[in-house]
Amino acid sequence: MADRLRELTQTRLQKIWIPHQCDRLQQRRGSSIPQFTNSPTMIVMVGLPARGKTYISKKLTRYLNWIGTPTKVFNVGQYRRDATQSYNNYQFFRADNQEAMKIRKQCALHALKDVHTYLSREEGHVAVFDATNTTRERRSVILQFAKERGYKVFFIESICDDPDIIAENITQVKLSSPDYTGCDREKVLEDFLKRIDCYQMNYEPLHDDLDSSLSYIKIFNVGSRYLVNRVQDHIQSRAVYYLMNIHVTPRSIYLSRHGESELNLLGRIGGDSGLSVRGKQYAHELGNFIKSQQIPDLKVWTSHMKRTIQTAEALHVPYEQWKALNEIDAGVCEEMTYEEIQDHFPEEFALRDQDKYRYRYPKGESYEDIVQRLEPVIMELERQENVLVICHQAVMRCLLAYFLDKTAEELPYLKCPLHTVLKLTPVAYGCKVESIYLNIEAVNTHREKPLNVEVSRDPEEALDTVPEHF
């Protein structure tokens, strides 16, 4: 019985919705398509080119994956590039170019087929269909496709009539597009504006009355205004909540662990100890570094724990404390060394190595738990401009995984060394990372996953990757 309970608490949860093996859901004659509460969702982008649809698609996908909702982007433009191999000019997108129109339609259908495979056979929960989808006819095809398979549909329409924003988007993103390899800036701008004109001729935005039964959000001019209609469930609610918090203002986020602590020196996890001598030196150097950066309107955040607060105090600037930034709660293993955990709880030590992301310390937390409590922090980071977050190893890994789009399996093993600042600068479709070591020595607290993760392993094998400590 105990083994069974162990299995139930340590096994990864699967989604409730289970697709039928056939292509379409079975339905009794005269009945409607069943709509399960947890049925898969198609998020469908709508809008003219250079309106930030791909930016929104990738960013939203990264967020949903981070919170544990399996999500994938299906970019129809990439299907088109794969099918045509070469791009000549805007004339490919003319409405009277019948041959090109046929290719574009086939690419969209191919992408929809892959959406079905992902949602029905690959345990996906959300598929983001990234294309212009500017006509009612195209959107009707997508709606019918989703209806036949029992998928929910949520539209995201990005509307922008500010020529400066459009030109900036073309310059930042389209210049590096495979469509324009080797082209100069002026030719790219000219051709892409003509491509937009081709779509503009037949553009039919979502209509307040005609589309009143649909679920959607309209985003005007990169978030200056929003219109939300008929949100159906928590996935759509979270998508709306997220989209209303993000912005594109240039900024940097600085992540740093606290200075080396007294318990770090002893190789003990958790606790609430103060800084070591070297930790205090780092706090001083961190203050000098931040001052040298001359960062406008910098906000500084810490956890409620002594070692992050002592680190922030050395900066001589105002700071805010977040309980959500506290280190992972190791429960019964608090303030123990890895050697002591292996000695007292060898089974728990092995179970954590088997699935470090989902393993929860007895009476403590898992990395998965930390991600859930960090969601408000991520939302506020998305709203802010320049921020320095002084936190802890597990927390920093979770934040870093969000910005770098890392999987749950990669997250617990991201390297976040002491006395090092990570400067994260959002770029077009990702995040640029700079690692700045402030030249103050510290112990190594990073433990790699050992080769043998079985409960029956020898203690030497279990402790093989434990870093040296005093």
Curated annotation (Swiss-Prot):
Annotated positions binding beta-D-fructose 6-phosphate: R80, R104, T132, R138, K174, R195, Y199
Residue span of region 6-phosphofructo-2-kinase: 1-249
E.C. designation(s): 2.7.1.105, 3.1.3.46
Modified residues annotated as Phosphoserine in this record: S31
Keyword field contains Iron: no
Activation and inhibition: Phosphorylation results in inhibition of the kinase activity.
Gene Ontology BP annotations: fructose 2,6-bisphosphate metabolic process; fructose metabolic process
InterPro entries referenced in this protein's UniProt entry, alphabetically: 6Pfruct_kin, 6Phosfructo_kin, His_Pase_superF_clade-1, His_PPase_superfam, P-loop_NTPase, PG/BPGM_mutase_AS
Protein family membership: In the C-terminal section; belongs to the phosphoglycerate mutase family.
Summary of the function given for this chain in its UniProt record: Synthesis and degradation of fructose 2,6-bisphosphate.
PANTHER family: 6-PHOSPHOFRUCTO-2-KINASE/FRUCTOSE-2,6-BISPHOSPHATASE, 6-PHOSPHOFRUCTO-2-KINASE_FRUCTOSE-2,6-BISPHOSPHATASE 1
Protein's name according to its UniProt entry: 6-phosphofructo-2-kinase/fructose-2,6-bisphosphatase
Native organism: Aquarana catesbeiana (American bullfrog)
